[in-house]
């Protein structure tokens, strides 16, 4: 099923023509309404009256997160604050949040693209969605909620946390679809396993997972643990929120970007030059239809690639690959380039832990010191019978001590860097208010 089949299957030449028209209109719109963009375009020598559309797009400088922070809170709004129907904000690692505004029409588009995404993931009108994304300033909860209602679903707005209650509601209400972070889906699967509830006893059929990077190994764990087909939903609050793209349940080989609203590019992280199809680079978006806070060439920092290969689902919109990392997530520790995904691959091969972790880097004098905080699995935690996992407890328990040493050794062998390993009880890895795992904390900056 498709939510908007005519738009989702638009022939590429018609889709490109629509993008051309909307891009030209957007450049004129922000030039007139947003002083920041007027200065940016003037300095780049881009005149909206002579702007030729897609071929001129690379002439426009990138918009970066620092630009949003420099104009906090409402300096990039293109409409009077009174015309803004809703404000969301993403929690930054430091300082003020990144604020995004939405007009009533922006919220309508938001609901439509999420409805498209849910339908691509297998959801249908009349199904029930157990929405375990956080509600509030974080876009996840309200974003999925609005899209599900637009699709005609029944929404259970359970939000994040309270795992025991979530387990009860899933068993009692019997929803067909769940939306949450991949790590929380793993938590729920483990909780059902602990209670002796098999996947076959659950009503769940589809899981819509996002808000943090995940791997095919995690997908396999979730699919088997909950008895679902899980798809990736991608988005970021600066662009609109969740629903910028979603995998189709037919292939699950890349997420369809809704290109009539979000114009994607992949560029070289060092030079900023556009890269051809299939090459990995930084994902950049231009919002073609946003009214309250449109963005030109927004640098997401996410590393991925694009493919225009035809999809068996029939959708014509370009697909993006998985997020392979972030330009700001790569850590250089004592001269070694370290990506969180490398560490995660090691952890996935160790059954006593789960890939819920944080890498913390500090500077001690002139040297970098790195710590890996990682959760042990529920079964292992029960087996060792400890209430806390302090350094003293780990040193005294030969199983914990051996596990800590094994993790450190495998990371040294596979990643090439020595990390101090700290074992955490289940559920104790640092998370943001929206429930997202915070994989990297670089305290050297």
Swiss-Prot record:
Its EC number is 6.2.1.30. Keywords: ATP-binding, Ligase, Nucleotide-binding. One of its GO terms (biological process) is phenylacetate catabolic process. Belongs to the phenylacetyl-CoA ligase family. Monomer. Catalyzes the activation of phenylacetic acid (PA) to phenylacetyl-CoA (PA-CoA). Involved in the phenylalanine metabolism. This is Phenylacetate-coenzyme A ligase. Optimum temperature is 75 degrees Celsius. The enzyme is heat stable. It catalyses: 2-phenylacetate + ATP + CoA = phenylacetyl-CoA + AMP + diphosphate. InterPro entries: AMP-bd_C_sf (IPR045851), AMP-dep_Lig_C (IPR028154), AMP-dep_synth/lig_dom (IPR000873), ANL_N_sf (IPR042099), PA_CoA_ligase (IPR011880). GO terms for molecular function: ATP binding; phenylacetate-CoA ligase activity. Pathway: Aromatic compound metabolism; phenylacetate degradation. It holds the Pfam family AMP-binding.
């Amino acid at each position: 099923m498709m939510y908007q089949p005519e738009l989702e299957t638009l022939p590429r030449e018609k889709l490109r023509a629509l993008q051309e028209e909307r891009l030209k209109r957007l450049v004129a719109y922000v030039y007139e309404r947003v002083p920041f963009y007027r200065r940016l375009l003037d300095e780049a020598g881009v005149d909206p009256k002579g702007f030729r559309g897609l071929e001129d797009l690379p002439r426009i400088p990138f918009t970066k997160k620092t630009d949003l922070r420099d104009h906090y809170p409402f300096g990039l709004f293109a409409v009077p604050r009174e015309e803004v129907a809703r404000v969301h904000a993403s929690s930054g690692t430091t300082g003020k949040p990144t604020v995004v505004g939405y007009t009533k029409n922006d919220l309508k588009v938001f609901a439509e693209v999420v409805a498209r995404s849910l339908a691509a993931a297998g959801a249908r009108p009349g199904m029930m969605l157990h929405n375990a994304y956080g509600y509030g300033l974080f876009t996840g909860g309200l974003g999925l909620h609005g899209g599900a209602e637009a699709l005609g679903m029944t929404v259970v707005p359970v939000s994040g946390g309270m795992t025991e209650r979530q387990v009860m509601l899933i068993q009692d209400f019997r929803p067909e679809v769940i939306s949450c972070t991949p790590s929380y889906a793993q938590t729920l699967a483990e909780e059902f396993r602990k209670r002796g509830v098999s996947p076959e006893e659950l009503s769940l059929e589809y899981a819509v997972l996002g808000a943090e990077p995940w791997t095919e190994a995690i997908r396999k764990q979730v699919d088997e643990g909950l008895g679902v087909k899980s798809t990736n939903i991608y988005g970021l609050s600066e662009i609109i929120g969740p629903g910028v793209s979603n995998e189709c349940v037919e292939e699950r080989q890349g997420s369809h970007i809704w290109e009539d609203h979000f114009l994607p590019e992949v560029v070289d992280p060092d030079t900023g030059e556009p890269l051809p199809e299939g090459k990995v680079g930084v994902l950049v978006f231009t919002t073609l239809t946003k009214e309250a806070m449109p963005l030109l060439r927004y640098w997401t920092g996410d590393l991925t690639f694009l493919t225009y290969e035809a999809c068996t689902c029939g959708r014509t919109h370009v697909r993006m690959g998985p997020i392979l990392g972030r330009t700001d997530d790569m850590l250089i520790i004592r001269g070694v380039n370290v990506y969180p995904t490398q560490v995660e691959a090691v952890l996935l091969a160790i059954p006593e832990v789960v890939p819920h972790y944080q890498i913390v880097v500090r500077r001690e004098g002139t040297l970098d010191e790195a710590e890996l905080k990682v959760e042990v699995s529920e079964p292992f935690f029960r087996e060792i019978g400890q209430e806390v996992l302090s350094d003293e407890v780990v040193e005294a328990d030969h199983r914990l001590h051996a596990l800590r040493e094994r993790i450190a050794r495998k990371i040294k062998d596979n990643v090439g860097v020595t990390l101090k390993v700290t074992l955490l009880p289940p559920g104790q890895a640092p998370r943001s208010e929206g429930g997202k795992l915070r994989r990297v904390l670089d305290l050297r900056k």
